[in-house]
Amino acid sequence: MTMVKDYRNKVGSKTGGIKLYTELKQDFVNQDIKIGRDKFYCFLRLHKLLVPKTKNYITTTNSKHMFKKYKNLIKDQVPNRPEQLWVSDITYIKTQNGHNYLALVTDAYSKQIMGYKLDNHMRTSLCTDALAMAIKNRKYPKQKLIHHSDRGFQYCNPKYTEFAEQNGITMSMTEQYDPYENAVAERINRTLKYEYGLKQTIKNTDLAQKMADEAVYIYNHLRTHFSLDLRKPADVHRNPDIKYKSYRKNKVNLTELTI
């Protein structure tokens, strides 16, 4: 039980059973603890350490505007290398002083959060600052890159699209407001909020910023991902030759992006 609690304190209190078993398996061997996955699950259940499922959805998208809306360039396609496709989204963070907002730019292949910005407004500059950080953090700046988002006014604003295009980035957007059209970004929002405490009402913006910084670091460098064959985003991003097969079973055959 101590190993489980120590790992969750380090990586995230909502880390599930499969990831726990995978990460702790060598520790069990080192301490001569003989336990299989099913028995480990029973142990978690017995001690009420299984993570309950949660569900919620609140929109932060306002697509009723006159700005140009771009075509969806990635429909039914998946990336095959880092910095081929970035996905962006905004999520709200509750504080005792009112809502703050967290803009994220994530690499769709490695799942690494490339840039982020937290503030008490949803102006275009929130997203532009996150994108600027992502561009600064590029490891492969000569690679062609698509930026995919919903049709929110921040992403359609010429101040944002022109900044992206000036940096060699091609814009792509969802066809309609449906979170499943930007599923990678939505999933990351959910993970940060539910696994790293950003779902709760936080005392103030300074504390929210500190928690966001810590959450992004853990997410990128310490947390394993089913979609990366239980690898860590930073490792996959640094090593583009590493090809992974998603741990999740997916019956949909999608073509690879060709840019």
Feature roles, as predicted:
Residues 112-116, 172-174, 198-199:
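Short small-residue beta-strand/loop micro-motif enriched in glycine and branched aliphatics
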Residues 4, 20, 40, 74, ...:
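Mobile genetic element proteins and their domesticated derivatives, centered on retroelements
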Residues 1-82, 232-242:
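Basic, flexible linker segments flanking DNA-binding modules
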Residues 165-169, 191-259:
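C-terminal domain-tail junction helix/linker
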Residues 16-17, 36, 70, 83, ...:
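Hydrophobic (often cysteine-bearing) scaffold residues that line and stabilize catalytic clefts
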Residues 61-63, 149-151, 157-161, 171-193, ...:
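RNase H-like two-metal-ion nuclease catalytic core shared by retroviral integrases
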Residues 79-114, 120-121:
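An active-site-proximal beta-strand-loop segment
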Residues 98, 117-140, 156:
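Active-site beta-loop-alpha junctions of metal-dependent nucleic acid enzymes
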